[in-house]
Amino acid sequence: MDDVSKCPFSGGVKGFKNKDWWPNQLDLSVLHQHSNLSDPLGEAFDYAKEFKSLDLDALVKDLHALMTDSQEWWPADFGHYGPLFIRMAWHAAGTYRIGDGRGGAGTGQQRFAPLNSWPDNANLDKARRLLWPIKQKYGQKISWADLFVLTGNVALESMGFKTFGFGGGRADTWEPEQDIYWGPEGKWLADERYSGDRELAGSLAAVQMGLIYVNPEGPNGNPDPLAAARDIRETFARMAMNDEETVALIAGGHTFGKTHGAGDASLVGAEPEGADIAQQGLGWASKYGSGKGGDAITSGLEVIWTTTPTKWSNNFFWNLFGYEWELTKSPAGAHQWKPKHGAGANTVPDAHDPSKRHAPSMLTTDLALRFDPAYEKISRRFLENPDQFADAFARAWFKLTHRDMGPKVRYLGPLVPKEDLVWQDPVPALDHPVVDDKDVATLKSKILASGLSVGQLISTAWASASTFRGSDKRGGANGARIRLAPQKDWAVNNPAELAKVLSTLEGIQKEFNASATGGKKISIADLIVLAGNAGVEAAAKKAGVDVAVPFAPGRTDASQEQTDVESFAVLEPTHDGFRNYLSGKQWLSGEELLVDKAQLLTLTAPEMTVLVGGLRVLGANANGSKHGVFTAQTETLSNDFFVNLLDMGVAWTPVDKGEHTFEGRDRKSGAVKWTATRADLIFGSHSQLRALAEVYASSDAKQKFVKDFVAAWTKVMNLDRFDLKA
């Protein structure tokens, strides 16, 4: 067939998909990403094992050699690729945001769209191609994700800077992540994400579509350093950085290298995803001069900050405060700054022509570090105390590149720092024998005889474990931070009732630990999970099913000193469809928020379905809500939720203007039988979810429902047990 566009089996066909016909259809595909079907390494591949066999010293030596091995097809600025690789590592990690924990360097996503083609990542495709011979040499012993970060570290070391350390363990994924919301804009560098007085929407952190952080020319290209400071503070805070870390990162990064804006940006070609097939995954081919070296165009800015752009120094601050600055434009027409009255002439080297010299230059965002009062105070301290600056940058760089890796137990390799850092959410090491099966049975009996209800046991365990985020591996039951600020006071946890449950469980814990032999102890973290398990078993027994919920002791209890209250505050749920909880104004529908929560819990659609159905009848709703409790026998692990949801004898109507809550009335009598939210009714409305609900509503589903619920429950309880997965 000559015309492949007419072939229904060809990749060229442009037929409408379901999402084109029904744009508001709930998308479940985010629950089924990164399956073995897309992974060429197979299910048995163990990256941690491969990494441990890596000759790390040899790899680092090869990376050092690469730094000054300039290639004709993309020459190194100042004869050193270090600054390019720092930018590569920074931009791999810098997509992280604290709001939902998504983004970051953890899976090597810079290889894929959209990140590989973001305007802010222009010409980083060249950095990755420069790395390919080394990646090829070491194969699967080092992931792209780890290699990006390690290369950034080696780049810094090769230019005289002492880094804080490096932890490996980032396993690659093999397709773009679909769960990350990058913004509402349909055009590069647009900023529809703002409302009101420059209020940034949702969990977004970057100021414009396709930028990692902020616009270096100032907000929307307005060269106002103070306005830029406001954007910087908001954006860096949403990426987990305080003012000191922000100043250190900007100044430290801009101690090296240059920006590129040699000529007319309209002469630059398409990004990698839009480039011709003959470009083989490269983009931004430029028709300006040679298109490379001294003719390179990346951001459109042409800035060299320091006199020694391939050597660590304090020169960024010397220049920032040593000159008065005036606005100018780059050869590409972008706003930047130069010293007034021709000062600083010939103090800065040219990147490619040793016969040329320049004056230093600065970005609008650099000047924010001088003219914003809080930033200026920090900057002057760093100017006067270079050792403090170096330490702050080393720590901030380590945090930047490791923030999305979760607890320290996940770090691999000999370069992991010994120091525990509070942002790593540390928990104490296990220092005692754990309970055995006989102890577990005894404890469960005491829990069930304590007067606590099944609903209280299950709600508390869920509240503890379901804080976990698969995005940045934070939260979870280990540490029992549900008993500490801020979690103990979260509205979703019903603080008054939670305090009673914890007090009872702590009494059982103290009694057991005081009487146990052989030094055995049980942590409150373990006991909370065990109590939830006991509740599930009791509820299953009431439904006529005997089941043993798996339990793996070994959790420990964190202290308040090990818990950064401000850092943990971002984990507070504003929604949890599993508990039928929704607070405040949301930017997604109830069913979309449920799927978002399920994705963060690494659940599949069947796991999400069985958990919602089970938790509803077990009485786990937040604050005793009756929405979705489609049963006359609560605290019984039955399939009643699904049976009654699919009952054609009930008709549903919304009870509020926004259609968030609904009444289910008997079709004959008109009497209200049930109430529900969108997070309930979606299991009868959405065709895929209804198909799953039908499985569990069937007359032969009794055993399967309990078995599947227990499996999904256990998965959630153990999401942060990286020690079990090692």
Swiss-Prot record:
GO CC annotations on file: cytosol
Give the start-end ranges of region Disordered: 334-359
Q: What is the organism of origin for this protein?
A: Bradyrhizobium sp. (strain BTAi1 / ATCC BAA-1182)
* PROSITE patterns xrefs: PEROXIDASE_1, PEROXIDASE_2, PEROXIDASE_4
Tell me the Gene3D superfamilies matching this sequence. 1.10.520.10, Peroxidase, domain 2 (1.10.420.10)
Tell me which EC number(s) this protein carries.
1.11.1.21
GO molecular function annotations of the record: catalase activity; heme binding; metal ion binding
- Pinpoint the site Transition state stabilizer: 87
Catalytic center at which residues? Answer: 91
Check the record and name the CDD domains matching this protein.
catalase_peroxidase_1, catalase_peroxidase_2
Upper lineage is: Bacteria, Pseudomonadati, Pseudomonadota, Alphaproteobacteria, Hyphomicrobiales
Q: Name one Pfam family in it.
A: peroxidase
Q: What class of enzyme is it?
A: oxidoreductase
Q: What keywords sit in the KW lines?
A: Heme, Hydrogen peroxide, Iron, Metal-binding, Oxidoreductase, Peroxidase
Q: Report which superkingdom the organism of origin falls in.
A: Bacteria
In the record, the note on similarity to other proteins reads: Belongs to the peroxidase family. Peroxidase/catalase subfamily.
Kindly state which reaction or reactions the protein catalyses.
H2O2 + AH2 = A + 2 H2O; 2 H2O2 = O2 + 2 H2O
Q: What does this protein do?
A: Bifunctional enzyme with both catalase and broad-spectrum peroxidase activity.
What is the official name of this protein in its record?
A: Catalase-peroxidase
The cofactors required by this protein are: heme b
Give the record's subunit note.
Homodimer or homotetramer.
Q: Does the keyword Electron transport apply?
A: no
Residues that bind heme b, according to the entry? 254
Q: How is the cofactor bound?
A: Binds 1 heme b (iron(II)-protoporphyrin IX) group per dimer.
